[in-house]
């Protein structure tokens, strides 16, 4: 028994728990941080000359992309200087108009009349009669009455304001011609709604094609083209040849330029304002009956067209008279020279002495 006891190991060194000191010795030593490199005096001087800053730059956006450069802000002194320069020499803006009137070029660059925006103009008030028809037989009877009135006139030319209305949809585009309005006398306007009309009455076709009738309006040629597309019994070309576009006529008589709308032409010639409500202009012109706002809108369009025609006719007569008197007094050569200069005869003709 003792023999066996002496041979058995009392304590194994392998089973001994190592001391804490042994574990501490086996731990991986921490890596010491590198000391921040200090710039030498020469490097600091180079950075100062280069304008570098030691402040870390903040980047925005994705990593790897350079940060957007910040815009340089002007100092108050620089801003004041720029404002003063702009006030002294304002930037020239290119006009959106295609042409410039000869009147504006002749009068030291002053704006042409069609560009002048009046402060306040009185709105047009139409107090005449409005004759409104929707059925084919009624339209035919009314057109025949106007035709007989035209034939009784002693003048060789009878001006007639002409305009059209139709519905418009942004999905389907323009609809069929729905309304024709005419005016031969400022005291009465005729409105023909074509919704129930499959074919234009012969009396109405005869009226607009009558040799004594001079149809006029703004952008009137396109109206005739559309009318001919919607109603094959109408031929556009004869109507286009004899019609008068009030905008083009105004450019000839008043020596202006550019394209005109009825609203601007009314401001310039009649010195009136038009209530061009988008709600009425884009309304359902094909729906019977038309309401009071639609009837007044349609009547005013042709009424003011007749007023503008009469005024342009008067101005043209005055201009022709002044030009003839100038030719008799100064000769054709002086007249051509004045036309070349672009002077307006209505205001300059009596100031020229040769």
Swiss-Prot record:
One family name in Pfam for this protein: DNA_pol_A_exo1
InterPro entries associated with the record: 3'-5'_exonuclease_dom, 3-5_Exonuclease_domain, RNaseH-like_sf, RNaseH_sf
SUPFAM superfamilies listed in its UniProt record: Ribonuclease H-like
Gene Ontology cellular component annotations, sorted alphabetically: nucleus
Metal-binding among keywords: yes
Stretches with biased composition (Basic and acidic residues): 13-50, 71-91
Family statement: Belongs to the WRNexo family.
Function: Has exonuclease activity on both single-stranded and duplex templates bearing overhangs, but not blunt ended duplex DNA, and cleaves in a 3'-5' direction. Essential for the formation of DNA replication focal centers. Has an important role in maintaining genome stability.
Name the record gives this protein: 3'-5' exonuclease
Organism: Drosophila sechellia (Fruit fly)
């Amino acid at each position: 028994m003792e023999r066996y006891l002496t041979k058995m190991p009392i304590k194994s060194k392998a089973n001994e728990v190592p001391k804490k000191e042994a574990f501490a010795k086996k731990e991986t030593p921490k890596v010491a941080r590198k000391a921040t490199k200090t710039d030498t005096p020469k490097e600091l001087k180079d950075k100062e000359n280069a304008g570098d800053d030691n402040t870390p730059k903040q980047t925005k956006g994705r990593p790897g992309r350079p940060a957007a450069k910040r815009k340089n802000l002007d100092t108050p002194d620089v801003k004041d200087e720029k404002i003063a320069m702009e006030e002294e020499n304002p930037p020239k803006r290119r006009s959106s108009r295609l042409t410039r009137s000869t009147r504006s070029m002749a009068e030291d660059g002053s704006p042409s009349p069609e560009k002048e925006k009046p402060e306040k103009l009185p709105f047009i008030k139409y107090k005449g009669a409005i004759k409104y028809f929707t059925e084919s037989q009624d339209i035919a009877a009314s057109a025949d009455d106007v035709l007989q009135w035209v034939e009784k006139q002693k003048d060789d030319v009878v001006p007639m304001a002409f305009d059209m209305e139709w519905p418009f949809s942004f999905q389907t585009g323009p609809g069929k011609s729905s309304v024709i309005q005419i005016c031969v006398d400022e005291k009465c306007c005729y409105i023909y709604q074509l919704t129930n009309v499959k074919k234009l009455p012969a009396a109405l076709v005869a009226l607009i094609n009558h040799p004594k009738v001079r149809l006029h309006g703004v952008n009137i040629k396109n109206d005739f083209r559309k009318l001919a597309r919607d109603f094959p019994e109408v031929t556009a070309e004869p109507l286009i040849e004899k019609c008068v576009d009030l905008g083009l006529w105004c450019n000839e008589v008043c020596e202006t330029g550019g394209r005109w709308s009825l609203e601007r032409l009314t401001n310039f010639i009649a010195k009136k304002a038009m209530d061009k409500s988008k709600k009425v202009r884009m309304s359902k012109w094909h729906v019977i009956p038309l309401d009071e706002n639609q009837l007044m809108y349609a009547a005013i369009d042709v009424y003011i067209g007749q007023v503008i025609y009469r005024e342009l006719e008067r101005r043209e007569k005055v201009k022709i008279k002044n030009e003839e008197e100038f030719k008799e007094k100064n000769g054709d050569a002086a007249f051509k020279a004045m036309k070349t200069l672009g002077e307006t005869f209505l205001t300059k003709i009596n100031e020229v002495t040769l």
